């Protein structure tokens, strides 16, 4: 069996192009692109996915080995596609951060912070808890496979070398951010209702009993009742989030 070594440069260039798209996406993917995960692990995951995707979509790449400029432009195009896909998946986590921020404010815990492992910075405690719980459920339910499936489908929508429509990208970003904020508010809706009713009740109590220190009674009572509500609705909240994530992944690629 003879191997035509003249094909190796083109194959190597195709490998690097596929790796550019997948690597950019992995660096932003929920669960894989966290700041506390070593870069070598991220690169290993991207390399493994590249070895899987390359045989499936090698024919989609038409590499011109005579022009380094066109090769670099094509690689930049692949990186941008990977960033768009990864950032869209990453935005889904912001829904939990929005919900956590609203819940913390309604329970009087807006001052309680901790390190957010997904962002590498300080964040509200409840928001961090919901984010970690959401990531755990994504892996426990194999929903992260949908991100990989979206990556595979992206070759049908964003063909290598084809000029990306800025309108499609803008529409994708707008829908992603709007949906994340909407879901975040829906997840925190029970606590918004609780906060409204509770604060009205405290206001009435303060007018009826002016000598009573309402603040010292209201804060611990708000936290206690709020956590009771949190325990009752957490299952429904995370179920809603998982359905939202699955819907985003299914709608990620069919833009046109």
Q: Where do the PLM segments sit?
A:
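Hydrophobic alpha-helical segments and their helix-loop boundaries in membrane
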Residues: 1-256
């Amino acid at each position: 069996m003879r191997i035509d070594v003249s094909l190796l440069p083109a194959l190597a260039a195709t490998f690097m192009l596929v790796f550019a798209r997948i690597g950019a996406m992995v660096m932003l993917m929920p669960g894989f692109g966290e700041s506390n995960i070593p870069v070598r692990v991220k690169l290993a995951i991207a390399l493994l996915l590249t070895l899987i995707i390359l045989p499936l979509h090698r024919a989609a790449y038409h590499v011109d080995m005579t022009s380094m400029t066109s090769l670099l432009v094509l690689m930049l195009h692949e990186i941008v596609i990977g960033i768009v896909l990864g950032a869209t998946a990453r935005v889904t986590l912001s829904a939990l951060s929005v919900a956590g921020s609203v819940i913390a404010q309604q329970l009087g815990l807006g001052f309680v912070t901790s390190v957010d492992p997904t962002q590498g910075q300080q964040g509200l405690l409840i928001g961090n808890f919901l984010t970690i719980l959401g990531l755990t459920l994504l892996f426990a339910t194999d929903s992260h496979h949908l991100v990989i499936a979206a990556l595979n489908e992206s070759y049908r929508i964003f063909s290598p070398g084809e000029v990306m429509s800025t309108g499609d990208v803008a529409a994708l970003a707008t829908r992603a951010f709007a949906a994340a904020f909407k879901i975040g508010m829906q997840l925190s809706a029970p606590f918004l209702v609780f906060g409204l009713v509770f604060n009205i009740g405290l206001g009435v109590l303060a007018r009826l009993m002016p000598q009573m220190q309402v603040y010292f009674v209201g804060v611990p009572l708000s936290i206690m009742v709020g956590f009771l509500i949190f325990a009752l609705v957490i299952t429904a909240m995370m179920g809603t989030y998982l359905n939202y994530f699955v819907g985003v992944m299914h709608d990620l690629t069919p833009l046109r």
